[in-house]
C-alpha cells in the first residue's frame, strides 16, 4: 500500500481535484508558480551601499532599541515609493504625516501602558503588604508569635 486510505468516502476524489487545480496554476518542470519573486542577488551596487548605510546608522544610533537584518532592509527598499525616478512632494509629505501620526499614537499608547504598569505595581505592593499583615495575624492567633 503506497498511500493512506481515506476516512470518509469521496475524500480521494477531492484530493485528486486539488492536485489537478494545483497543476493548472503551476508551470515548468519543478511546479513553481508563474509569479516570480524579486531576485535579491541581482541588486544594484548602489542599493548594496544604501543597505550598508542603513545598517551602520541603526547599529550606531539605535542598537539598544532595534535590530534589523538584510531581508527587512530589502523589503523596505523594494517599496515602489523609493524606486520611483521622480519624487512627488505631495506623496512625500503625506507619508511623513502618516509616520508622524503613527509615532504620536505609539508614544501615547506607550505612556498609557506605562501608567497601567505603574498602577499594577502599586496594587501588587499593596497585596504584598496585606499578605504580610495577614501572616502575622495568623501566627499570633495560632500562638506561633507573641507580638503583632
Swiss-Prot record:
Presence of keyword Membrane: yes
GO cellular component: membrane; viral envelope; virion membrane
InterPro entries tied to this protein: Chordopox_Fusion/A27 (IPR003436)
Region span, Disordered: 1-34
GO terms classed as biological process: fusion of virus membrane with host plasma membrane
Positions with biased composition (Basic and acidic residues): 16-34
Keywords: Membrane, Virion
Short name of any one Pfam family annotated for the protein: Vac_Fusion
Subunit structure: Homotrimer, covalently linked.
UniProt family annotation: Belongs to the poxviruses fusion protein family.
Protein name in the entry: Putative fusion protein
The species this protein was found in: Sheeppox virus (strain KS-1) (SPPV)
Lineage: Viruses, Varidnaviria, Bamfordvirae, Nucleocytoviricota, Pokkesviricetes
Amino acid at each position: 500500500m503506497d498511500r493512506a486510505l481515506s476516512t470518509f468516502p469521496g475524500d480521494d476524489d477531492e484530493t485528486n481535484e486539488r492536485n489537478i487545480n494545483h497543476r493548472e496554476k503551476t508551470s515548468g518542470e519543478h511546479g513553481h508558480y508563474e509569479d516570480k519573486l524579486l531576485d535579491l542577488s541581482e541588486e544594484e551596487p548602489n542599493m548594496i551601499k544604501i543597505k550598508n548605510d542603513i545598517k551602520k546608522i541603526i547599529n550606531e544610533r539605535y542598537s539598544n532599541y532595534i535590530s534589523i537584518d538584510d531581508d527587512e532592509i530589502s523589503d523596505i527598499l523594494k517599496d515602489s515609493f523609493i524606486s520611483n525616478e521622480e519624487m512627488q512632494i505631495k506623496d512625500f509629505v503625506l507619508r511623513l504625516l502618516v509616520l508622524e501620526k503613527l509615532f504620536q499614537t505609539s508614544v501615547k499608547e506607550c505612556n498609557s501602558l506605562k501608567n497601567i504598569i505603574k498602577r499594577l505595581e502599586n496594587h501588587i505592593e499593596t497585596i504584598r503588604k496585606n499578605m504580610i499583615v495577614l501572616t502575622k495575624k495568623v501566627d499570633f492567633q495560632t500562638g506561633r508569635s507573641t507580638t503583632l
